[in-house]
Amino acid sequence: MNIDYANLNLQYQNYKKNIDDAIVKVLKNSKFIMGEEVSKLEKNLEIFSGVNHAITCSSGTDALLLAMMAMDIQPNDEIITTPFTWVSTSETIALLKARPVFVDIEPDTFNIDAKLIEAAVTKNTKAIMPVSLFGQPADIDHIQTIANKHNLKVIIDGAQSFGSTYKNKTDSNLGDISITSFFPSKPLGCYGDGGAVFTNNNNYAEKIKMLRVHGQNKRNHHKYIGMGGRMDTIQAAILLVKLKYFPKELINRKIVADHYTSGLSDILQTPTIKPNKSSAWGQYTVRVNNRDNIQNELKKKGIPTSVFYPVSLHLQECFQYLNYKQGDFPISEKACNEVISLPMNAFLTYDQINYVVSKIKEHIS
């Protein structure tokens, strides 16, 4: 049996006519930049997320940049974040000449350990940037309490978690600003790069809308130094179609996750979802010993897996200048040696899930 990790083609086949029609409409109208589909998508994202402002952009990475630029993050400002995530989180901080300050993670959720954050706050700290890793929000109440105490901003990196919830609020409606990514393999993905910034702050929203168009406040007049960060109309058209089916896909992803957990929880560490939270199941990530051997064995059986992430950010070459060293974040480092992500998409069948579970059990037992 061969299994597709994300199965984007099967998803496309299910929605083919609507997606094709949406793309053809854009081609006929030829409004490839900031066409009507962009504003329609933003309105629908606001409704789905329960937030006042959704501003689409060119990628999740650019969404992080736009969020920090809107907050006027300056060189040498410090932003507290996690070392166990995709590089964009800290890369964008560094691109603005600010400094990522890492705090270790919780061993069960892989999210930043809120109990350790306050010790990392200095006079230069301007914001906390938790990542909703693998689809589940971090301990936002605890983080927000620290932020309020020290007059800090909170930016939610929800690149992997669109559709998740924390105390019945969507992940996009947390913090001062939240972002997400619409990279194709994300819970809600387009057919290229795309992202969005979410906020209830009118001033941030107004500024972000200018920043994504080179800081332009009216045609050929530029209030800020900005960037070319708009979402293409075709991507917006695709997302408009897929957003209609997204609630059902979220349900299906949870069913897949629950079935995995039922079959695997007695032999390895399966994901922990904390009370008052739901996950968008951007990944289904477990811990195993002899991770590389297990990954190779599963590959032989036609089961694709991924490792997110093999090297903690504080040990990446690009962040050597931060002067962290091996052993500084032991929970993150241990996770890098043990995590493996199993196939996760809304179209996995029970037979496929059972096959994955059985092959893992064969190798571990």
PLM features: residue spans?
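N-terminal "arm"/small-domain region of PLP-dependent enzymes with the aminotransferase-like
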Residues: 1-29, 36
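Pyridoxal 5′-phosphate
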Residues: 14, 73, 253
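Short beta-strand-to-turn element immediately C-terminal to the catalytic PLP-Schiff-base lysine
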Residues: 180-181, 195-200
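Conserved active-site segment immediately N-terminal to the catalytic lysine
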Residues: 156-189, 218-223
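Phosphate-binding glycine-rich loop
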Residues: 30-78, 92-96, 102-104, 169
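Structural detector of well-ordered beta-strand residues that form the stable sheet scaffold
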Residues: 55, 80, 101, 155, ...
